[in-house]
Amino acid sequence: KQWTWGNGDFGQAWDRNLTDTDGPYIELMTGVYTDNQPDFTWLQPYEEKIFTQYFIPYRELGVVKNATSDLLMNIETEDTKNAILKLFATSAQKGLRIVIKRQEDIIWENITDLTPKAVFTHTIKNISPDEAEVYIYCSTGKLLLSWKAESTEIKPIPEPAKPALPPSEVRSTEQLYLTGLHLEQYRHATYNPTDYYLEALRRDNSDIRNNNAMGLWLFRKGQFKKAELYLRKAINTLTERNPNPYDGEPYYNLGLVLKYQDKTVEAYDAFYKACWKAAWQDSGYYSLAQLSAAHNEWDNALYEINQSLVRNWHNHRGRHLKAMILRKLGREKEAIELIKESLNIDKFNFGCRFEAWLQSGEKEMPSSLRVLMRDESRNYEELATDYAQAGNWEDALAVVNAALTNISAPSTMLLYYKAWFLCRMNQQDEAVCVVSQAENSPLDEYFPNSLEAILALQCVTNLPIHAPKAFYLLGNIWYDKRQYQEAVDAWEHSKEMDNGFPTVLRNLSLAYFNKLGKKKEAVQLLEQAFMLDETDARILMELDQLYKRMDYSPKERLHLLNKHKEIIATRDDLYLEYATLLNLTGEYEQAMQLIDQRQFHPWEGGEGKVPAQYQYARIQLAKKSLKAGEYEHALALIEECFVYPHHLGEGKLYGAQENDFLYYKGCILEAMGNHDEAHSSFTKAASGNGQPTAAMYYNDQKPDKIYYQGLALRKVGKEAEARGRFNSLISYGEKHLYDTFVM
């Protein structure tokens, strides 16, 4: 689909923000296996979905009714009686047969050649596009393209999406499972899928699907031991009546959590059991091959990876694993043939390319592989952990060493991976040296998020060495995985080792406030973090927001910000907060000057905030001028509220509510003696929706707009309607005063 912000003031502001030439902006959105933009889908382990999308330039057609990669077609009304057919070919098309039907009757037929040089047009007499059916055949008679108008019958409007019920109100364990699954799929920001799974298990702790879902969720969060308990419960129920159950997924998931705990014998059994079911054979046998390779059982590993590839020929990691196994078996020729075949399927198979390099015996990594991997640390980490998953620590180490050689600024995490690999190779002293190197490296802006990173960091934090950075990164992963207590524990260890690490103090502050309810401690930590680095504008912004949450007065907050004006100027959000505080403390002139001298850039969550402060300062100054009898100045200030200058970074939305501006404009005009104009302004100010609603988004009507409607109605003599507006606000407030807001 195509998305545009429109051509109004709001849309033109986005044109300026999003295009180099400040011209029109159209956003193309495309998708496959999906009905709409947020319709996320599932991928099974090592699954590949294949699709082709064509982006085709065309001209002169108007609105395309149907298209293929070869032809584009439009049919539209030429006048009240006739229709015009337009065709555009992307390549030469000879002997096309074009048929126009009305119901079953052919009313026009033609055979023609098309080329991209000219658009084919033909007028069909005495028919409307709604009546016409278009069929286009190639010279051999194959139907290339067809179209007919959709039925004009009124279809029922689909029901809008409904919010999930609280877990306790969901009737069945099945619906609890489906709701949790939906929340996982759409990654809902405020609802927690585990609340639904756990409620289902509270009602029936043997439920297969909810136990499996909880186990899989915990596995993805790095909680392998906890996940194992749920998965074993699922399997116990699954095998009560049949030792070879219908579904193999819980066995496969159990194999994963056991493997990540180094319980390789039990993991092997679980994966083999999963392979009883066809749906899990490709991923199950692949995992078995990894385990066999880790134990140097190369013949078994080859058999298992072959079984996996039979079920999933395009498992590119499986192909890499097979190439490695063949190399270990000394079957280099077969390995090279497999690598060539694999690269014909996917030229970006880093694993196969790395295997080719290992087999070549060359000292330096080929430049072609470096170019494809872009000297990107993350690519090397992924490749190294592929080897690690197969217990091939030597080659995993070789990948990391290649990265450290080739990348000018490798991620610190590469060093921690190297230390992990060395530990697994029983080279602890060397691992300690590498961790020391990592701890003394600059902290990069890189945040690991993989399960292997958890294992690596857990390993290095157990070494006999001072490792505050490793604990810091481990805390980051745990927080990302929503394992908040583990995150706090890791950060507290980091803090104990290095109390001068501002980012750790900042992270702990957020966790204390948001997750543990330790508000005073959160303030102390964030203040300490900022004292350690008073150049960090983000921490200053967050400290001010924390003061705001703790109900510090605007003057107290200004006292902090006034000390750091240079830093404030580096962030739009902090700069705007400073201007807002000036407005709140009556420094309207200064606030207006600050806003007027800056070019703002929109940010998500900040929509509407800059114009709001721009307008608020002017309204307050206009009120002062009105009171002082400076009517012309007051009117000029109010008129500026109706226009969004470009430096605000935003445009005015169509239908923006301006009741307050119109009301004050009327008051000024009234004071100037322009009663007719004043009455007109009051009348406009009195219009709009008079029913209060929750103002959640920046373009929702704010309740004060209704208040100004009431004031304006009073000005035009409609006292009863004015009181109605005021009473509606009071009633809404009383009704919702004690509501618990859930988003």
Model-based region annotation:
Residues 1-48, 56:
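A contiguous, surface-exposed recognition patch within enzymatic or periplasmic domains that forms
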Residues 205, 239, 245, 279, ...:
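Short coil turns that delineate tetratricopeptide repeat
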Residues 64-171, 344, 348-354, 358-368, ...:
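Long, contiguous interaction/recruitment modules in multidomain scaffold/adaptor proteins
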Residues 174-175, 209, 249, 283, ...:
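Start-of-helix register in tetratricopeptide repeats
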Residues 181-182, 216, 256, 290, ...:
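Residue-level recognition of tetratricopeptide repeat
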Residues 197, 231, 271, 305, ...:
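Hydrophobic/aromatic packing residues within the alpha-helices of TPR/SEL1-like helical repeat arrays
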Residues 193, 227, 267, 301, ...:
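Single-residue signature of alpha-solenoid repeat helices
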